[in-house]
């Protein structure tokens, strides 16, 4: 069929993701998303984005979601912000700490992110990955300009990490993941 402007209509269909039990207490309505920034086939920074009541169940920081930094070596959450930079330590309205959450499938998530960057031919990207209760990690989208709020969530700048891996020759995905975790 065609649209009113006589151009073909396009629709995307995807499976409905099921929320893992781990995230039920800290996600409002929607599915949490792990954003991994990859440069030069090396994952350099990551955050967990949690949907909130303020963001109406969307994992979008600009709309009021929570961004939680992730330790690259362990896949464990560290520091957190809400919205555009308000520092928080607990899930709003609860006593649940945001630090110390162990992200399941961490190595696989990093591997998927590096492989997506290799296939895309983008020098720098943000891979958005959700975890389905039954199927594990699923790539939602790749972002050529993924935004910089990941730095606020991690209380750390990207520039130093990017400079550290610029020009490093990465022949295998495994090596890129290993360097990203060091």
List the predicted regions and their residue ranges.
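PAS/PAS-like sensory domains
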Residues: 11, 122-125
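Phosphate-binding site of ATP-dependent enzymes
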Residues: 1-82
